[in-house]
Amino acid sequence: LFVIPWGRHWIIGTTDTDWALDKAHPAATSADIDYLLGHVNRVLATELTQADVEGVYAGLRPLLSGESDQTSKLSREHIVAHPAPGLVVVAGGKYTTYRVMAKDAIDEAARGLGGDVPESATENIPMVGAVGYQAMWNRRAALARESGLHVERIEKMLMRHGVLITEILALVAADPSLGEPLPGGEDYLKGEIVYAASHEGALHLDDILARRTRLSIESFDRAITASRPAAELVAPVLGWDAATIDEEVEHYHQRVAAERMSQTMPDDAAADAARLQAPDRG
């Protein structure tokens, strides 16, 4: 069991069960939530209940098949195979080893090219926003003074965006209203919401509230309050008219309702059916 501090929140997980239903919308059941709470309550002085849970998310990871039917006993490692000329296959693995997987896959593909191809260097390439991070962190007080934002706000944004914070601060400098907190999602600036649409490829409201930010699991109302202000902020960037704003907000509300309903269900089949009442947009 993991109990991970995450800002003002704690992440508790994970379950380890098979999922044979819709792959695009895996859903946590009430039994899944109770399972995690039951385990964490063994070590807490004050027990948690489902009423204490702000948000829930579920995902899938591919496991290599084996002799056991129990997912907990299957390998978390990955394999790279070259089953046919020009075809490289990666199976298994997980998010935390994605760079090792990428290196192994590229090195395997390069072996089929012939000639002197250097090894993949992906594991040594800094992530986007990482180059110069420490120097900018050391300047966080100066960034706060220059932008008029509190230094704690700058620190949070640096941890989320790295040195790309300068792009958000440029938006704030051009429109100081974007330096205000998002109504209903005060851990984020309005400028961060606009940035999700202008620089990070968000196309729909749920892209912003559930993926570019984590507002959908960081508040008890699942970002319902923040949904319309967020939609209105990105409307000029994405070319939305009033009808599209209403449609995006309504779809997000339906998504939240479907997720909430799925998390009251006792089994996977019922949770899957509930979640699919509001599938994500492509």
What is each stretch, according to the model?
Residues 1:
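Phosphate/diphosphate-binding loops
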Residues 5-9, 15-282:
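C-terminal accessory subdomains/tails of enzymes that are appended
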